[in-house]
Structure formats: structure tokens, C-alpha cells
């Protein structure tokens, strides 16, 4: 079991953070979709990391998507982070800021 995190790299807090996560693809020749999970955080302080959810290693064979929406400086922002099938692998590790752990990161 691994954990997924959201990093607020901005110099100010972000608000009304909504994260939708899902996995999809093929496993053993069958099309697979995970349940869509939704997470809400009223506020995430600047230069902070928060744990979103655990992710099972068996799901690394799927494409894993995190769709993040938040309010910042009076505007709404929306971005999709996609870990394509097989990208969550030690070969793609980097040091994750603020927690000083190794993992896969998309900016």
C-alpha cells in the first residue's frame, strides 16, 4: 500500500480543494474501472503537503487520475494529474518536497 499526496507549492493557501481520483485500464485482458473517490479540503496552507488516500500496488497497472480543483486569489483553478499505466515505478522516483520521501511526482 502506498499513499498519494497533494502538495501546495504556492506561497499562499489554497481553498475549497476538491480532488476526484479514479483508476482505469485493463487487467488480465479485462477492462477495469475503480470507484471514483472524492476528497474535500476547506483549506491547504502554503508550502504544505496533505495525504489524499492510500493506493494499492495492484492498481499501478492501471492509469490513475487525480482531478484537482481549488480557489486561489479569487479564481478557480482546475488541473488533471494522470499517472499512466506503469509510471508509478521505482525507476521514476524523485525526492518529494516537505516529507523527504522517495516517490513519483507530477507538477
Task: Map each language-model feature to its residues.
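A generic structural motif
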Residues: 7, 22, 69-71
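A short, structured loop/turn motif at beta-sheet edges
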Residues: 9-14, 44-45, 72-76
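Short acidic, flexible loop segments centered on an aromatic residue
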Residues: 11-28
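Intrinsically disordered, low-complexity Pro/Gly/Ser/Thr-rich segments with frequent PxxP/GP/PP motifs
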Residues: 27-61
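Terminal connector regions
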Residues: 53-107
